[in-house]
Amino acid sequence: MKTLLLTLVVVTIVCLDLGDSLICYLGYNNPQTCAPGQNLCYTKKWCDAFCLQRGKVIQLGCAATCPTTKPYEEVTCCSRDKCNPHPAQRSR
């Protein structure tokens, strides 16, 4: 009986995955589970040489802290699952 109870507890812990696993987009429609310790999703945008033709470059990912920005970059951070979709996904 004790063995059965212990087995149920272990299975429950494994199934629940007690660690807080954040899911962020790492690319267009590409959600991934972040590594342990990375509790933020981010969206970074900037213009490159093709900005007028293609629009801003967009980088999506996971981070432990919100990335620092350079003067020409825009960075947005959030802490909920899938809170950083590609801007093209939001408009659908």
Curated annotation (Swiss-Prot):
Q: From which residue to which does the signal peptide run?
A: 1-21
Tissues showing expression: Expressed by the venom gland.
Recorded GO molecular functions are: acetylcholine receptor inhibitor activity; ion channel regulator activity; toxin activity
The function of this protein is: Binds with high affinity to muscular (alpha-1/CHRNA1) and neuronal (alpha-7/CHRNA7) nicotinic acetylcholine receptor (nAChR) and inhibits acetylcholine from binding to the receptor, thereby impairing neuromuscular and neuronal transmission.
- The principal localisation class reads secreted
**Upper classification of the organism:** Eukaryota, Metazoa, Chordata, Craniata, Vertebrata
Q: Name one GO cellular component term.
A: extracellular region
Keywords, in A-Z order? Acetylcholine receptor inhibiting toxin, Disulfide bond, Ion channel impairing toxin, Neurotoxin, Postsynaptic neurotoxin, Secreted, Signal, Toxin
CDD domains per the UniProt record, alphabetical: TFP_snake_toxin
Q: Does the keyword Secreted apply?
A: yes
Q: Which Pfam families match?
A: Toxin_cobra-type (PF21947)
Protein name as it appears in the record: Long neurotoxin 469
Localization (cell)? Secreted
Q: Which cysteines are joined by disulfide bonds?
A: 24-41, 34-62, 47-51, 66-77, 78-83
Q: Which species is listed as the source?
A: Drysdalia coronoides
| Similarity comment | Belongs to the three-finger toxin family. Long-chain subfamily. Type II alpha-neurotoxin sub-subfamily.
